[in-house]
Every structure is written in structure tokens, then in C-alpha cells.
Amino acid sequence: MVRYRMRSPSEGPHQGPGQDHEREEQGQGQELSPERVEDYGRTHRGHHRHRRCSRKRLHRIHKRRRSCRRRRRHSCCHRRRHRRGCRRSRRRRRCKCRKCRRHCH
């Protein structure tokens, strides 16, 4: 039996290092101390600040099943001054990863 771990809240400061960690995990989801609230808010806001695409754009990308990186480019013929024809009319590639794109040309 492990009775020495069951202690009243008033005896909190006398806990050992093992029990301290357990109590932290349990209380993390329910309530946050002032320091943790600040950290939590900062990381949460930081996540949104560094979002690459707007929700509308992500929704469009998801509908058309395109990767975010490819969508950020302008049109397929926008920067090409010499006329090669439209690249979109070519056969679709199977995989969009860099390795496969390099070998599919």
C-alpha cells in the first residue's frame, strides 16, 4: 500500500520531487497559475500570428487539393516572359514532394 502519497492540500510544500510532478500534470488542464496563463496566451497568439495563409485561402486550397506552397505562387505563366505555353495543361504529376517533382520533368 502506498499511503504516504495521500496528503492534505495544506501539506503541499512538503511534497517530494516525484509527487510534485504528478500534481502538475493533473492540474495543467483544469487551472493555470498566473505565469502559465501568460505563457499559454503568448504561445497561442504566436501560433496565429505566424499563420501563413488566411482561412479563405486555406479553404480554397483544401477544396482544390493543392499544397499551400504551390498556391502562394502567382499564375503558372506570370513570371515567364518567353512563351513556353501553359504548364497547367500538362499531365498531372503523381506526387508533389520535391524529389518526385525533380524527377518528373
Swiss-Prot record:
Its main location: nucleus. Residues 1-74 are annotated as: Disordered. It is found in: Nucleus; Chromosome. Residues 43-74 have a biased composition (Basic residues). Proteolytic processing into mature chains is required for histone eviction during spermatogenesis. Transition proteins (TNP1 and TNP2) are required for processing. It comes from the Eukaryota. Pfam families: Protamine_P2 (PF00841). One of its GO terms (biological process) is spermatogenesis. Testis. Keywords: Chromosome, Developmental protein, Differentiation, DNA condensation, DNA-binding, Nucleosome core, Nucleus, Phosphoprotein, Spermatogenesis. One of its GO terms (molecular function) is DNA binding. One of its GO terms (cellular component) is nucleosome. The keyword Transport does not apply. Belongs to the protamine P2 family. Interacts with TDRP. This is Protamine-2. It comes from Rattus fuscipes (Bush rat). The gene is Prm2.
